[in-house]
Amino acid sequence: MEWKIVVPLLAVAFTVANAGLVGGPMDANMNDQGTRDALQFAVVEHNKKTNDMFVRQVAKVVNAQKQVVSGMKYIFTVQMGRTPCRKGGVEKICSVHKDPQMAVPYKCTFEVWSRPWMSDIQMVKNQCES
């Protein structure tokens, strides 16, 4: 008799555990315009905060997620690196140095909260480590 109760409960628990949390973070597609715009915003804000004369760019996207929260929260884990372009210079496409000693790579976690209907986008987390 107990197995008639235990088996369905285990099946429900297994299904819920594998389905993911409703409203929780999910993988973001880097081909999506909203995701790309949020990452670009994060990079611009990050560069404003760095005490370096050179622009930093994303060398590699390690992880990208999004979460519906009264708007959209984007969570990025990225590998950043220095470019040869100086801050405040003429805007052009700048790639990260190929030489790791020049690129000085480091890992960052950025969180961006976007509410497009309010024309509002904010950086809520900008955390980096060497």
From Swiss-Prot:
Annotated SMART domains: CY
Site (Reactive site): G23
Keyword field: Disulfide bond, Protease inhibitor, Secreted, Signal, Thiol protease inhibitor
Disulfide cross-links: C85-C94, C108-C128
InterPro entries in alphabetical order: Cystatin_dom (IPR000010), Cystatin_sf (IPR046350), Prot_inh_cystat_CS (IPR018073)
Tissues of expression: Ubiquitous expression including brain, white muscle, heart, gill, kidney, spleen, liver and skin with the highest and lowest level in brain and gill, respectively.
GO molecular function: cysteine-type endopeptidase inhibitor activity; peptidase inhibitor activity
Signal peptide annotation: 1-19
Family: Belongs to the cystatin family.
Protein name per Swiss-Prot or TrEMBL: Cystatin
Phylogenetic placement of the source organism: Eukaryota, Metazoa, Chordata, Craniata, Vertebrata
